[in-house]
């Protein structure tokens, strides 16, 4: 359940600091959020797909850790990212 190349490029353009910025915390969180949203739609149709659900939980955990790191190191960027993504924090 990966994202298309176009979707990734759009996220990189919106949240990246440069053209090839794939490693910044904001980009990683935005990519994880897009994948999580995609999987949530998948589970509306495939309720009993427990293998993918485990992957979803890993993504949510990774996003939570990245957000905690960003909040601890740069609170202003954290708040901007939360607002852009529409996360409940």
Curated annotation (Swiss-Prot):
GO cellular component entries: cytosolic small ribosomal subunit
Record's keyword terms, sorted: Ribonucleoprotein, Ribosomal protein, RNA-binding, rRNA-binding
Gene Ontology molecular function: rRNA binding; structural constituent of ribosome
Pfam families reported in the protein's UniProt record: Ribosomal_S15
The keyword rRNA-binding is assigned to this record: yes
UniProt signal peptide: none
Any one GO biological process: translation
Keyword rRNA-binding: yes
Disulfide pattern: none
Subunit structure: Part of the 30S ribosomal subunit. Forms a bridge to the 50S subunit in the 70S ribosome, contacting the 23S rRNA.
Similarity annotation: Belongs to the universal ribosomal protein uS15 family.
Purpose of the protein: One of the primary rRNA binding proteins, it binds directly to 16S rRNA where it helps nucleate assembly of the platform of the 30S subunit by binding and bridging several RNA helices of the 16S rRNA. Forms an intersubunit bridge (bridge B4) with the 23S rRNA of the 50S subunit in the ribosome.
HAMAP family: Ribosomal_uS15_B
Name of the protein described by the UniProt record: Small ribosomal subunit protein uS15
